[in-house]
């Protein structure tokens, strides 16, 4: 009889091992066997929980996305209710510690690349993109006309992605302070009359 709660503990252990494997060996070097080795369990157990490598990557990305959505929700709730503060909170969530560790950043890069070839990952990417745009648009719409709010949301989303991507590819720890400053300056520019 399986231990109560063991399924979630084991899944978390395997997702952590997947993040470490992608960090150390990249997506091509990440296999069910490499994940099993890092988690000190059999390959059969990895297969039991996730089926195959695609299932493992999907579960890992769902975990990373949940962390992002949790950080976004937490920061928006904690922020003052004005659009500028809430927009800054959304930006900060994208540069949250849960999103900028080397294993997570490399997993994001692998996910983006693989999402162009895998329908389930593509769907996850579209959900994430729409959620970010919707959150940004909702806040900009409190201060700007609808069309401008949509354009501002698209611009800020592109800036977030660009700053994040440059940081991820820089080869060292991401300079979140510099990224946040640039994004805040952009928000301030758009809301200058606010």
Swiss-Prot record:
Q: InterPro entries attached here?
A: BetI_C, DNA-bd_HTH_TetR-type_CS, Homeodomain-like_sf, HTH-type_TetR-like_transc_reg, HTH_TetR, Tet_transcr_reg_TetR-rel_C_sf, Tscrpt_rep_BetI
Q: Which residues bind DNA?
A: 31-50
Alphabetical keyword list? DNA-binding, Repressor, Transcription, Transcription regulation
Q: Which GO terms describe its molecular function?
A: DNA-binding transcription factor activity; transcription cis-regulatory region binding
Task: Tell me which positions the record assigns to the signal sequence.
Answer: none
One Pfam annotation, family name? TetR_C_6
One BP term from GO: negative regulation of DNA-templated transcription
Q: Which residues form the HTH tetR-type domain?
A: 8-68
Domain of life of the organism encoding this protein: Bacteria
- Known pathway: Amine and polyamine biosynthesis; betaine biosynthesis via choline pathway [regulation]
The function of this protein is:
Repressor involved in the biosynthesis of the osmoprotectant glycine betaine. It represses transcription of the choline transporter BetT and the genes of BetAB involved in the synthesis of glycine betaine.
- Show the HAMAP family listed in the entry: HTH_type_BetI
Q: What is this protein called?
A: HTH-type transcriptional regulator BetI
């Amino acid at each position: 009889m399986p231990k109560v709660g063991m399924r979630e503990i084991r899944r978390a252990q395997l997702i952590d091992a997947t993040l470490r494997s992608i960090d150390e060996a990249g997506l091509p070097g990440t296999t069910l066997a490499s994940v099993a080795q890092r988690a000190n369990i059999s390959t059969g157990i990895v297969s039991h929980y996730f089926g195959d490598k695609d299932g493992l990557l999907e579960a890992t990305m769902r975990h990373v996305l949940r962390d992002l959505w949790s950080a976004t929700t937490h920061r928006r709730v904690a922020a003052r209710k004005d659009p500028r503060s809430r927009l800054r909170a959304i930006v900060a969530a994208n540069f949250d510690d849960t999103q900028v560790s080397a294993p997570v950043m490399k997993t994001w890069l692998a996910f983006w690349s693989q999402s162009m070839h895998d329908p389930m990952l593509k769907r996850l990417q579209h959900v994430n993109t729409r959620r970010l745009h919707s959150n940004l648009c909702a806040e900009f719409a409190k201060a700007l006309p609808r069309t401008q709010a949509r354009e501002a949301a698209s611009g800020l989303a592109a800036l977030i992605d660009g700053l994040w991507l440059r940081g991820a590819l820089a080869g060292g720890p991401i300079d979140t302070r510099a990224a946040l400053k640039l994004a805040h300056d952009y928000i301030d520019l758009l809301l200058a009359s606010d």
